[in-house]
């Protein structure tokens, strides 16, 4: 693989070697070029809507990479690329930029990458430089990053598509982009357009996400299999991390939640350092990254391998709700609609479980559902865990969109308004879903044990 794209190595079942036409494993130069052309087409449509002056203007698109961030002197955090830049280029190197330019339709690509520097490469590893970047991406016009400002000045765009309110690379923004903006061009936000493109996954992207789901499912099975009473959350965390990497993941997609007992009712608990007692359940919300695409799966199970009657009751209630929500995952339905359905189904389960009285009105049952499940039913998924935040969850789902479906019920141990047997129990069940043309969605996490019988069977496989 080119030095430009060393992040995470090149492991896993999906690809053993990157072919000559691939920029990142599974994604070719043609795919990245098509993404840039689609973005140019979206801007062309936007320009036409703004009137004849805008459609005849010189348009510039500016997308910056992330810089390296440091946790302390000389100690960097693991590098995480700006996903919009990565989506359009495939480049995993910091201190880089992409510019698209053209009259009416900005379809001419110019890349900027750091200059080769043997002194820095001794410490940080090889850079590709201009020639390597051109060979990797197929983009013919490549400059050193230090030339970005001069090139922008020479292009003289009258409409600039750029997100500068919170620049992802403050240094490049201040040195190279800000002088251009001070010249008074019309500036329009690019992020809504890139997110609308990223939301619709190509077959190649779905294949990468499917592999991320397969890897994560294997990690869940292995982690369930080593569970036992009085086990440290840190050990489960380490096992899950190890198994993801051992099965081909580059790394975890986010700090996982490994929450035993009542800690499962803290939605973003990530301390993962307490003992899960014999007879308690553990909630593990985790996922991996596989060549720039992620999984996000949650399972809840008893660490001693057997659900108690109360645990089984609550678990089955959440599972029934999740099945109902999954059945709605089809084109034309929105995440907000599925969320409304989730609340109604949870309200019904709360009545059946006796957590609220059977005589509770529908309106009060919905209030109780919001109390015991204070989060949405899901979110978009892709290169990021909470992907494409510019997209509203009220938008109708389309084939190729990837989402999560993750209902839960969380009963705090000090809640004296519910039957005692449920206090201190928290259950969430989360799957990753791709919307398809057919009625049935593609469940990327389908190999992860989910029924009580399958979970208990996985726990018994020590």
Task: Outline where the language-model segments fall.
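Active-site neighborhoods and metal-handling regions in enzymes and metal-associated proteins
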Residues: 1-462
